[in-house]
Design a protein with these regions (language model features):
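Structured mid-to-C-terminal alpha-helical surface segments
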Residues: 1-47, 58-61, 73-294
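Glycine-rich beta-strand-to-loop/alpha-helix junction loops that act as flexible
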Residues: 50-53
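Anion-coordinating catalytic cores for phosphoryl-, nucleotidyl-, and glycosidic chemistry
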Residues: 65
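Structural signature of FAD isoalloxazine-binding scaffolds in flavoprotein oxidoreductases
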Residues: 70
Length: 294
């Protein structure tokens, strides 16, 4: 079942497709299977789906995403999760070659599928034969969130996913843009993910189209950042946006954007668009504050 679906994606993909993008695309049916397992299982269906894959599958984010992220109210039982998932893949999906690795912190589970050789994507000894899917399972950090249950249809079935709502995800993304400690290689001096830049711009576009009725869940943002003022948070974000290295943004996004033309167009316009969007959000916040005082 798994091999056939991956082979179908290969057959539909053009030969000129960016190989990094292709490997990410191959993860999508694997993501669907893990999500079906999680949300059809009585022990795990309370998990809160979050992150870029949540935004793509439930809210239409126009880029690929590679990992599955879950927040858990309470303390996650990762050992049971791994054992139950291995049984599901082996017995229900009839795929018996998957192995798993758990990180030293115990919150990151990597699923290893040795499928790339038979798909024709191993060309030398330097190429890995393994397609990796990471699941990050963490305790929900603040207790401040909104959640909703949404149907998710895949090629095989439909099930119901418990996920953060858009204001919560917007707030988490803004906090990640400012607070994430991530660098890609030794040449990156400022910590950020290009994916956070893309996603934040997408959120701000949606919010602006709704005349700023869509806002980050500000109590969550302030709790995650240890901040006390929404306007100051937005100003910090605008300062960071103005100083981004666009080549590093593009390098991080390359496995998730289909064409180099689209990637170049995005990275070329970051410094003009993102600070302006954040300035507009600041103006909307100040206008709202003035309205509350009168």
């Amino acid at each position: 079942m798994i091999e056939e679906r991956l082979a179908s994606i290969m057959a539909q993909s053009g030969r000129s497709l960016n190989p990094l993008f292709l490997r990410t695309r191959l993860k999508e049916p694997l993501q669907d299977e893990v999500l079906a397992f999680v949300y059809n299982h009585p022990q795990y269906r309370s998990y809160l789906f979050t992150g870029g894959t949540c935004l793509r599958k439930l809210y239409g984010l126009p880029r690929l995403s590679e990992d599955l992220d879950f927040d858990v109210p309470g303390q996650p039982d990762v050992a049971s999760f791994v054992a139950d998932l291995r049984e599901y893949v082996s017995e229900t999906l009839q795929y018996r070659h998957m192995t798993t690795r758990v990180s030293g912190t115990g919150i990151s589970v990597t699923l290893v599928f040795p499928v790339l050789r038979q798909l024709g994507l191993v060309h030398s000894s330097a190429d890995t034969p393994n397609l990796l899917l990471r699941c990050d399972i963490a305790a929900e950090p603040t207790g401040i969130y909104g959640a909703q249950v949404s149907p998710l249809s895949t090629a095989q079935t439909m099930f119901f996913v418990r996920a953060y709502d858009l204001p919560t995800l917007f707030g988490s993304k803004l906090a990640a843009f400012l607070g994430r400690d991530y660098t890609r290689g030794s040449s990156q001096t400022q910590p950020f993910k290009g994916r956070d830049v893309f996603d934040l711009m997408w959120f701000l576009q949606k919010a602006q189209q709704q005349e700023w009725k869509l806002q980050p869940l500000w109590p969550r943002v302030l709790a995650l950042l240890g901040a006390d003022n929404a306007v100051n948070v937005v100003r910090r974000a605008a300062d960071k946006a103005a100083s981004l290295d666009t080549e590093q943004v593009a390098a991080d996004l390359r496995p998730f954007i289909e064409t180099e033309q689209a990637l170049e167009a995005f990275s070329t316009n970051i410094h003009e668009v993102l600070p302006a969007q954040l300035k507009a959000l600041e103006k909307a916040l100040l206008t709202r504050q003035d309205g509350q005082l009168t």
